[in-house]
């Protein structure tokens, strides 16, 4: 079971990816983790990554594809894998296709922008413990205060509405077109293309999980 997950930041990809990887006993392959592991291992690719990162540059798609090819040869990928955070753009998706890296399913978790803004901008955090609240869905007993310590809660920079909207804008410009790429591929060459699964990411975690798993055969 070889899977790519798509969805805007805050759509709930991480939680659902965990359900999928446990159900099918496959690893979740994060590009960030792969890059860090390659640098640590000081492999040939790792040294290239280290050089690029040290200069403040972006690691090329070619290097990331090579790392993915290397990673999916590992024994824990014998049942498949779930790609997290890649591809993000159409050129990356085309590179993955050109290298012949087979994908069985592309799973999109679809959530309206305003719902995502509400989810993320409503989060409040207790810095000392990392406890997370939500002003609407999981409020503290006393507004703005941690339940355990009574200390003030903060809103992280990443959760501020302006930041969330910027992240969504980037997602719609770069990653959302992948939906069309994979749908079009499935229409033109259904035998070769990954099967496209789209699920509304609103409702209970269990119901979203069940919708996804029912379509992954």
From Swiss-Prot:
Protein name listed in UniProt: Adenylate kinase
Binding site for ATP: 10-15, 123, 132-133, 203
Matches recorded under PROSITE patterns: ADENYLATE_KINASE (PS00113)
InterPro entries (alphabetical): Adenyl_kin_sub, Adenylat/UMP-CMP_kin, Adenylat_kinase_CS, Adenylate_kinase_lid-dom, P-loop_NTPase
Record region (LID): 122-159
Pathway noted in the entry: Purine metabolism; AMP biosynthesis via salvage pathway; AMP from ADP: step 1/1
Keyword Kinase: yes
One annotated GO molecular function: adenylate kinase activity
EC number per UniProt: 2.7.4.3
Main subcellular location of this protein, as a coarse class: cytoplasm
Record localization: Cytoplasm
Binding-site residues for AMP, renumbered to this chain: 31, 36, 57-59, 85-88, 92, 156, 167
Catalysis performed (reactions): AMP + ATP = 2 ADP
Domain notes: Consists of three domains, a large central CORE domain and two small peripheral domains, NMPbind and LID, which undergo movements during catalysis. The LID domain closes over the site of phosphoryl transfer upon ATP binding. Assembling and dissambling the active center during each catalytic cycle provides an effective means to prevent ATP hydrolysis.
